[in-house]
Amino acid sequence: MLSPKRTKFRRHHRGKMRGVATRGNKVSFGDFGLKTLEPGWLTSRQIEAGRRAMTRYTRRGGQLWIRVFPDKPVTIRPAETRMGSGKGSPEYWVAVVKPGTILYEMKGVTPEIARSAMRVAGFKMPVKTQFVVRDV
């Protein structure tokens, strides 16, 4: 699963997900892409589940790019802990996505297979997604 090798700070603020994606919103490597339609957090497990579903569907055909990276740590406090005594310890990593962010790109397969594979991966995501084709 994806996670940073090292970070400057161990804990992050939760932040706000306002507006639409201005970067990472175009299909730039492959011919087909999976685009988000709403804001959300994608965990490294969800990103990996989508990748596995697509590679399994395409039977390792074509080429696949993952365009998002989970670089935000999410902290969780232990169960039945009293308030105070600092922030919890980092438990997992998330990628913050805005509407319009391209999650995956694919090349080297037919449009029908790409659409079906992206649809399978979209079911694994916590946000609504859409299949997009590269603008020529």
UniProtKB/Swiss-Prot annotation:
Compartments where found:
Plastid, Chloroplast
Question: By its UniProt entry, which InterPro entries does this protein fall under?
Answer: Ribosomal_uL16, Ribosomal_uL16_bact-type, Ribosomal_uL16_CS, Ribosomal_uL16_dom, Ribosomal_uL16_sf
Recorded hits in CDD domains, A to Z, give: Ribosomal_L16_L10e
Out of the domains of life, which is the source? Eukaryota
Database matches in Pfam families: Ribosomal_L16 (PF00252)
SS bond list: none
Q: What is its main location?
A: plastid
User: Got a GO cellular component term for this one?
Assistant: chloroplast
- GO function term, MF aspect, one: structural constituent of ribosome
Example GO BP: mitochondrial translation
Q: What keywords are annotated for this sequence in UniProt? A: Chloroplast, Plastid, Ribonucleoprotein, Ribosomal protein
Record's subunit section: Part of the 50S ribosomal subunit.
Family to which the UniProt record says this protein belongs = Belongs to the universal ribosomal protein uL16 family.
- The identity of this protein, by name, is Large ribosomal subunit protein uL16c
